[in-house]
Regions:
Chain B
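ABC transporter nucleotide-binding domains
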Residues: 2-7, 12-207, 213
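A short linear hydrophobic-aromatic micro-motif
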Residues: 122, 250-255, 285-290
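ABC transporter nucleotide-binding domain
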Residues: 173-266
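Short beta->alpha junction loops/turns
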Residues: 66, 234, 238, 268, ...
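C-terminal coupling/interaction segments
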Residues: 267-312
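A generic structural signal for secondary-structure junctions
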Residues: 63, 104, 143, 222-226, ...
């Protein structure tokens, strides 16, 4: 038998192998380049405002930074990164069926999923952090926000919230990638359909979203910025907000992520990842 | 018999389709051919043995243990799949390197193992080229190489000869025989009888998800020799040939054409003897004769109709 074949699966080594393998796969994908470009794209907005808006009513750098960080980076780009970067490591192996080579080797399924997830977190966090950093610098040019402890603290907090978003959305994406054949479609419906709708539905439906907890971690309270109301011909319905403390929000997202990662591992162990059925099978 | 692989009433179905039905076999060490036409259930059997599928009923054990998600068992199994599943833009070397890492080798050892495996299948020259540039035969070699990477004790080769040129086939035949001689268990799946015959004399006949026979290939050959056949004789005078053959009571029906005589016989050996006599007499020229149904499908049909009890 092989000179260095392990007797039993080594969790650490398997995780490391899966992590580095996922890095090499992800970094050479066109999808990665596309998402890198999208992540730095919001930088042009403050630059555009600085160059072309001359009125006294133009938005300040601080306002633009907050809006871009919250609405573009955290609410839009984190779920996008989770779906498009997160699914490279898992879904491509499943779609191309190269997963059968892995599943017939003594690699821990837990380590394989964790390694892939860590690689996704590293790459997606880096892209998000670079985007927010460049946007921050561009907004500083506009004024009312400075490169000081307050400014850097705010920027760091938004990066932190974004990373928590990547954690939550990423874990759900991984579970979808392992459990379903259409993770991107289901993910888009969940992240951009349900998540947005639930934040307007009166009651506590928003507690079943990641966005609720991310909003709770923002530097400024959500109630101070949003006036969520549904306007209809019968009148406007104001959504009552129930607050969650930032600490509870962090714990909740961590627990949700752990549950979904566990489910992803369970699906890898349970599912039969192979397409070539017998003749006549459906 | 020291059973390396053992199944008990193993069944697998996908929806309403039964891929494998109540299979109970014991596979010994050495090279064993898994012989059956396309869609017979060979790949399903292999995937069950590798733990890629869960049995719908019954069980399969490798060295006495269930294989699914069993790392101890997986570390001694090698698998060359029938289908091409690759990450196209990576090189053959890189593809194998990561699989070696997953098999538990450290980077240096992994590179050495990959080099050795690629040398064994003669792919060293092109090993840094992207897989997308490889021919069908090269891809097949890469698949074989990855299955040998970790020096497995039990190897499953699912239709490994597909797409290989004659030289590569010959090399693979020698490789498989060599592995068998080293004491390894090689399950060699094919739908071509003579391919299996080249590497082993022990076969499992599988058809429609059922194991028809497990035994020596000579016995299968005998069955082929003796089962009813359709023989096509090429001659300028088919009617006269038939008149000469009419003494053979095994012939059940005939068809005439301008140049061909097609006869259906219950005893092909006897009919071949008669044809030989006609040729030796030299009165009527016979240009050629051949069996029109000398394929596995007809053999299996014959085996099912004669050797499988009704109701199975």
């Amino acid at each position: 038998m092989g000179i260095q074949i392990k007797k039993i699966s080594n969790l650490y080594l398997d995780t490391k192998t899966s992590f580095y393998h996922a890095l090499t796969i992800t970094l050479r994908r066109d999808r990665f380049l596309l998402m890198s470009a999208i992540c730095v794209l919001p930088v042009v907005i403050p630059v555009f405002v600085a160059l072309f808006s001359r009125t006294v009513f133009r938005e300040s750098g601080l306002d633009i930074f907050i809006r871009l960080s919250e609405q573009i980076y955290v609410h839009t780009l984190t779920p996008l990164l989770a779906l498009f970067i997160g699914l490279i490591g898992i879904r491509e192996e499943v779609d191309s069926l190269t997963i059968i080579y892995l599943l017939t080797r003594p690699v821990s399924r837990l380590a394989w999923v964790i390694g892939r997830f860590l690689a996704y977190m590293l790459i997606a966090s880096f892209l998000l952090a670079i985007g927010i950093l460049f946007t921050f610098i561009a907004c500083v040019v506009l004024g009312s926000i400075h490169i000081d402890s307050i400014g850097i603290g705010m920027m760091s907090r938004y990066i932190g919230v974004g990373i928590m978003g990547l954690l939550g959305y990423g874990a759900i994406s991984f579970m979808l990638g392992c459990a379903t054949n259409y993770p991107i479609i289901i993910g888009v419906i969940l992240f951009f359909g349900w998540e947005k709708a639930a934040n307007f539905i009166p009651g506590i439906a928003d507690f079943w979203t990641i966005q609720k907890y991310l909003d709770s971690m923002f530097p400024v309270l959500a109630s101070q910025r949003y006036n969520r109301a549904v306007m209809t011909v019968l009148g406007s319905f104001q959504k009552e907000l129930f607050f969650v403390s930032p600490l509870r929000a962090v714990i909740t997202i961590s627990v949700i992520s752990a549950i979904f990662i566990f489910l992803a591992i369970w699906f890898v162990l349970w599912r039969e990842f192979t397409k070539d059925r017998v003749v006549g099978a459906r | 018999m020291d059973a390396q692989i053992e199944t008990k009433e193993l069944s697998k179905w996908f929806g309403e389709v039964v891929a494998l039905n109540n299979v109970s076999v014991q596979i010994p060490s050495g090279v064993v051919g898994l012989l059956g036409p396309n869609g017979a259930g060979k790949s399903t059997f292999i995937k069950l043995a590798l733990g890629l599928y869960r049995p719908s009923r019954g069980e399969i054990r490798i060295l006495g243990k269930k294989p699914r998600n069993n790392f101890q068992i997986l570390s001694i199994l090698g698998y060359c799949p029938e289908m091409d599943h690759f990450v196209e833009e990576v090189s053959g070397f890189e593809f194998l390197y990561w699989l070696a890492r997953y098999s538990g080798y450290h980077p240096k050892a992994a590179k050495k193992r990959v080099g050795d495996a690629l040398e064994r299948v003669h792919m060293v020259e092109r090993m840094y080229d992207p897989i997308s540039t490889y021919s069908k035969g090269m891809r097949q070699r890469i698949k074989v190489a990855q299955s040998l990477l970790h020096d497995p004790q039990i190897l499953f080769l699912d239709e490994p000869m597909n797409g290989l040129d004659p030289t590569a086939r010959e090399e693979l035949f020698h490789l498989v025989i060599g592995l068998g001689n080293e004491g390894k268990t090689v399950v060699f799946s094919s739908h071509v009888l003579h391919e299996v015959e080249r590497v082993t004399d022990t076969v499992i006949l599988i058809y429609n998800g059922r194991v028809l026979a497990l035994g020596k290939i000579r016995e299968i050959r005998d069955l082929i020799q003796n089962h009813p056949r359709t023989i096509v004789i090429e001659t300028m005078e088919p009617k006269k040939v038939y008149q000469l053959l009419s003494s053979d009571s095994n012939i059940t029906s005939v068809n005439f054409d301008t140049q061909f005589l097609t006869v259906h016989t219950l005893d092909p050996l006897q009919t071949f003897k008669c044809i030989n006599e006609i040729i030796l007499e030299g009165k009527i020229p016979i240009f050629s004769f051949h069996c029109a149904d000398e394929d596995l499908q007809s053999v299996f049909q014959y085996l099912i109709s004669t050797h499988i009890p009704r109701g199975l």
